[in-house]
């Protein structure tokens, strides 16, 4: 075992003469180039085979009848299939905003149901307010409000805070906030 360790150490410390270094590097590239090319071709062929197995069922062709296809045929079939896909109707900005808003309200209702931060009545009033807010806003303006934290003051049950002092009851707001002007076209998502 000792001779192998010595041989490994000597190979690790081996430094060819400056003229030989370039020659050895060139020879190494020449020997590695066919291996790299072989690997590259294997990757291309594997990807084309996967593409063929994916695309044939989608265009209604039988894999067994098309076992031998040229690479160009596979690529052409794929391009035709992708061109024939009908374009997806993009939701407009307001619909995406409303969808995100609804998801947020649903998540909040699940959290409020489990927590005991608000009384049942206050929790219900908050959820009713949040469910009404986008409808009231959509009648006033045609765009979603800019991102901001809502200023909703709710009546909290007379419990004590973490520090032992009673929590103060504050009147709740029944009007939705007016829709602010739209500053940019990006959509704010609460998550």
From Swiss-Prot:
Signal peptide: none annotated. GO terms for biological process: cell differentiation; negative regulation of DNA-templated transcription; negative regulation of neurogenesis; negative regulation of transcription by RNA polymerase II; nervous system development; positive regulation of gliogenesis; regulation of neurogenesis; retina morphogenesis in camera-type eye. CDD domains: bHLH-O_HES2. A motif (WRPW motif) lies at residues 188-191. Keywords: Developmental protein, Differentiation, DNA-binding, Neurogenesis, Nucleus, Repressor, Transcription, Transcription regulation. It is found in: Nucleus. Residues 1-26, 159-191 are annotated as: Disordered. Gene3D superfamilies: Helix-loop-helix DNA-binding domain. Its main location: nucleus. InterPro entries: bHLH_dom (IPR011598), HES_HEY (IPR050370), HLH_DNA-bd_sf (IPR036638). Residues 28-85 form the bHLH domain. GO terms for molecular function: bHLH transcription factor binding; protein heterodimerization activity; protein homodimerization activity; RNA polymerase II cis-regulatory region sequence-specific DNA binding. Induction: Differentially regulated in the ectoderm and neuroectoderm by notch and neurog2/ngnr1. Residues 97-130 form the Orange domain. Expressed in the animal half of the early cleavage stage embryo. During neurulation and organogenesis, the otic vesicles and retina are the main sites of expression; expression in otic placodes begins as early as stage 13.5, persisting in the otic vesicles at stage 30 and beyond. Also transiently expressed in the olfactory placodes. In addition, weakly expressed in primary neurons. Expression in the retina begins at stage 21, and is seen throughout the neural retina by stage 30. Coiled coil: none annotated. SUPFAM superfamilies: HLH, helix-loop-helix DNA-binding domain. Has a particular type of basic domain (presence of a helix-interrupting proline) that binds to the N-box (CACNAG), rather than the canonical E-box (CANNTG). Transcription repression requires formation of a complex with a corepressor protein of the Groucho/TLE family. Homodimer, and heterodimer with the other bHLH proteins neurod1, neurod4/ath3, hes1/hairy1 and hes6r. Weakly interacts with the bHLH protein hey1/hrt1. Transcriptional repressor. Essential in the retina to govern glial versus neuronal differentiation. Promotes gliogenesis through the inhibition of neuronal differentiation by at least two distinct mechanisms; represses proneural gene transcription, and also physically interacts with proneural proteins, including neurod1. This is Transcription factor HES-2. It comes from Xenopus laevis (African clawed frog). The gene is hes2.
């Amino acid at each position: 075992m000792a001779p192998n360790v010595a041989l490994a150490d000597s190979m690790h410390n081996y430094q060819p003469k400056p003229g030989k270094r370039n020659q050895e590097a060139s020879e190494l590239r020449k020997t590695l180039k066919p291996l790299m090319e072989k690997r590259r071709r294997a990757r291309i062929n594997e990807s084309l085979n996967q593409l063929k197995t994916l695309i044939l069922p989608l265009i209604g062709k039988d894999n067994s009848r098309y076992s031998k296809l040229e690479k160009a045929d596979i690529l052409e079939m794929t391009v035709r299939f992708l061109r024939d896909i009908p374009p997806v109707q993009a939701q407009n900005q307001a619909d995406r905003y409303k969808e995100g808003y609804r998801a947020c309200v649903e998540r909040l209702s699940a959290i409020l149901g489990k927590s005991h931060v608000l009384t049942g009545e206050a929790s219900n009033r908050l959820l009713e307010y949040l469910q009404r807010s986008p409808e009231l806003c959509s009648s006033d303006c045609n765009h979603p409000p800019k991102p901001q934290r809502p200023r909703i003051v709710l009546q909290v049950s007379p419990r004590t805070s973490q520090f032992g002092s009673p929590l103060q009851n504050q009147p709740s707001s029944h009007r939705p906030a007016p829709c602010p002007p739209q500053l940019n076209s990006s959509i704010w998502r609460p998550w």
